[in-house]
A protein has these predicted regions:
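Catalytic toxin/effector domains delivered as secreted proteins or via bacterial secretion systems
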Residues: 34-181
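HINT/intein-family self-processing domains that catalyze protein splicing or autoproteolytic maturation
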Residues: 1-36, 133, 144
Length: 181
């Protein structure tokens, strides 16, 4: 973590809040003096092979694992998530999304910002945001969202799907009992 001022993009605050940025670029809201527990040593950068091993253990085939890896722009980090830890899920309607992909906070003020920052597929309108909690401790995969220009072409809605948000991959979302609403 750093206590030095850091430039942050795509970020809006309406009131006074305390934020800290770690060397991995993770923005931590209202961490206060306890932010030392969120230091980068809690994150382990993984190789593609290590990510594939984790995803194979979760039941993904080679192509599904590669597609998930390709949804990241840059390094993929592993971190232990704890039961009760809360995340935001972005979906068309409350209850529709799987919860495999979540975020720490909202990925944008408008649905257009959320679609762009998370490079969402054409079937996710991002009109709803809900809070979900982890049902158990689990390994989370985290990193920066990659651009999805092919989805922008398919959607034909003028949203470029540039990515750049921070995504968290749970251990299967609602399909594996990893999250609850």
């Amino acid at each position: 973590m750093t206590d030095e001022p850091t430039t942050v993009y795509n970020f809006q605050v309406e009131d006074f809040h305390t934020y800290h940025v770690c060397t991995l670029g993770v923005l931590v809201h209202n961490a206060g003096k306890n932010y030392a527990s969120l230091e980068p040593d809690k994150y382990t950068e993984l190789t593609q092979s290590e990510v594939k091993d984790i995803l194979k253990e979760r039941g993904l085939d080679e192509q599904a694992a590669q597609n998930l890896i390709d949804s990241f722009d840059g390094p993929i980090y592993k971190r232990e998530g704890f039961k009760g830890e809360a995340f935001t899920i972005t979906e068309s309607n409350a209850g529709e999304a799987s919860g495999v992909f979540v975020t720490r906070e909202s990925a944008g003020i408008t649905h257009t910002e959320r679609i762009n920052n998370l490079a969402l597929p054409p079937n996710n309108t991002a009109m709803a945001e809900s809070t979900v909690q982890l049902t158990r401790s689990q390994i989370l995969l985290e990193g920066k969202v990659a651009a999805q220009p092919d989805w922008a072409v398919i959607a034909d809605d003028g949203i470029p799907r540039s990515g750049g948000g921070w995504q968290v991959v749970t251990d299967g979302g609602k399909y594996n009992g990893a999250i609850e609403r």
